[in-house]
Amino acid sequence: MVYELKSPLLGFEEIKEFDLVEVDEMFAKIKAINNPSIEITLANPYALREYSFDIPAYIQALLDINAQSKVRVFCTVVIQNPIDESRVNFLAPLIFNDDNQTAAQIALSIKDYPDFSVADKIKNYVKE
């Protein structure tokens, strides 16, 4: 499904639209429409750990999110070999509103969410 990015993706400010493809219940990827060579791996944070945060009011307004909206959340992943060494950024989740195909990334404060990290290893959450 193609989404319009309503606020810049950190480090990829030129991306305005991307295709979201779910790989399985844990992983997804986004591919830039204007530059298909840009592909970013995402993880479903809820499949990894207990994860909760408040979506700021300005993001709710930007994405037209209300109580009935179908919203999904993913976090960026830096893939490593082996996969359990890959790192997840829990402090900058991507918010997807499936109702109108819009998305935005937010930056959470470590002060407000001290249990979240920008580079948590997947192996800290996946049981072997």
UniProtKB/Swiss-Prot annotation:
One GO cellular component term: cytoplasm
Record keywords: Bacterial flagellum biogenesis, Chaperone, Cytoplasm, Translation regulation
Coiled coil ranges: none
Keyword NADP: no
Subunit structure: Interacts with translational regulator CsrA and flagellin(s).
PANTHER family: FLAGELLAR ASSEMBLY FACTOR FLIW
Full protein name: Flagellar assembly factor FliW 1
Species whose genome carries this gene: Wolinella succinogenes (strain ATCC 29543 / DSM 1740 / CCUG 13145 / JCM 31913 / LMG 7466 / NCTC 11488 / FDC 602W) (Vibrio succinogenes)
Gene name linked to the record: fliW1
